[in-house]
């Protein structure tokens, strides 16, 4: 399985607009949003805004970086 990330701007009605689509074999499996400075010490981390398929309905974790997010996604969709 090939995982890919595509940068996007996400309309969140908040300062957290920097986003990333997570694709598995060219299928959308998740939307991640980078937390803004208003989140204090969590600023710069990535939040699972929404998951699809096997990621739908799971707890919405916060990842230190995209590598950590990639590992988490790969474990759950394989």
Where are these regions (language model features)?
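Negatively charged, low-complexity tracts enriched in Asp/Glu with abundant Ser/Thr
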Residues: 1-27, 55
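Short aromatic-glycine-(Arg/Gly/Cys) micro-motifs in beta-strand/loop hairpins
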Residues: 30-58, 76-78
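A short, charged, amphipathic alpha-helix used as a generic interaction element across diverse proteins
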Residues: 61-78
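Acidic/proline-rich low-complexity IDRs
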Residues: 2, 20, 31-34, 47, ...
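Compositionally biased, intrinsically disordered low-complexity segments
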Residues: 11-13, 25, 32, 65, ...
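Intrinsic disorder/low-complexity signal
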Residues: 10, 15-17, 48, 64-67
């Amino acid at each position: 399985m090939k995982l890919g990330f595509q940068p996007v701007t996400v309309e969140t009605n908040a300062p957290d607009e920097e986003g990333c689509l997570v694709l598995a074999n060219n299928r959308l499996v998740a939307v991640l949003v980078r937390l803004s400075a208003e989140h204090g010490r969590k600023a710069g981390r990535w939040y699972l805004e929404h998951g699809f398929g096997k990621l739908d309905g799971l707890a919405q974790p916060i990842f230190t970086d995209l590598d950590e997010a990639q590992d988490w996604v790969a474990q759950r969709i394989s």
